[in-house]
Amino acid sequence: MTNIRKSHPLIKIINHSLIDLPAPSNISTWWNFGSLLGVCLMLQIVTGLFLAMHYTADTSTAFSSVTHICRDVNYGWLIRYLHANGASMFFILIYLHIGRGIYYGSFTLMETWNIGVVLLFTVMATAFMGYVLPWGQMSFWGATVITNLLSAIPYIGPNLVEWIWGGFSVDKATLTRFFAFHFILPFIITAMVMIHLLFLHETGSNNPSGLDSNSDKIPFHPYYTIKDTLGFMFMALTLTTLVLFTPDLLGDPDNYTPANPLNTPPHIKPEWYFLFAYAILRSIPNKLGGVLALVFSILILILFPMLHLSKQRSMSFRPLSQCLLWILAANLTILTWIGGQPVEHPFITIGQLASVIYFFIILILMPTTSLMENKLLKW
């Protein structure tokens, strides 16, 4: 009799994805982030569901309902901080996952990569709308500033903004719809993750060498299930340490003040994981130009397969390209720092320089370095 794992219509799908999946024998810990992101997504959905049971999406009670969750609900503080810091964890893992993809040339798996970019945009939209829900000062003003950027779109911009707001300012209608979208999007993300995996399993995973690994595959279970479990333990340790010791480390103190449309905070800024894009947005004095730069700073990921001119897939054996990638990582760190600083000298100039360097490295230096490495290797 055939094993039920291999014959049952539903169980065999899980079997082909997580148990008997042929995986390259040499994938490193950098390949753990996909499964970690899956666990993170499940954690966010579960904690979010419990928060939604006690939250009220109304401007007059939203802030106090979050306070009620933290003070009166059993372990409500834990659920709330797991959800808030889980989002930070999510983005740390996403950025490492993308960095891995760039370093090892995983973007050559075009469908998987493009679905991943769409996923990134969806996750960013979800996180942004989630940040609006507690209805603190930074929630309100962040929503006002970011939604207002759409008014830069020629002709339809102003109407589009009012349509999204559901009125002439960020108000009750905006909060209600943001809650509705924030609730539904994680399930859409889950469906997209399945498509992401479907395309990945069509081609098989990349590996650190960037070479074809069809001649040397091993089953996913037990080798990589145990390896992923170690990753889960590290993630759980990091997240619980953050939640139990410094839950507000990554938050903004302004969000502990209820939203007040008559009082603007001195420095409006998004959560830390958006600061690099926010710095790029602010570095351009023109509104439409800033919005385009903001969108393109993330959309640029789609161009990576076209900008890949090296004869080698991975950067493992390309020290010059490796240096460039680490300079890019340092540059993104500088942009993140600048995004959280006030708009004054010298931060304006540093932000503009870092923004130019960001695009210059990706669009010009990386392709030319690849060509130079080809020449050096006489390829």
Swiss-Prot record:
Disulfide bonds: none annotated. One of its GO terms (biological process) is mitochondrial electron transport, ubiquinol to cytochrome c. Heme b b566 binds at H97, H196. The keyword Membrane applies. Gene3D superfamilies: Cytochrome Bc1 Complex, Chain C. It is a multi-pass membrane protein. PROSITE patterns: CYTB_CTER, CYTB_NTER. Keywords: Electron transport, Heme, Iron, Membrane, Metal-binding, Mitochondrion, Mitochondrion inner membrane, Respiratory chain, Transmembrane, Transmembrane helix, Transport, Ubiquinone. It comes from the Eukaryota. Binds 2 heme b groups non-covalently. Coiled coil: none annotated. Belongs to the cytochrome b family. This is Cytochrome b. The gene is MT-CYB.
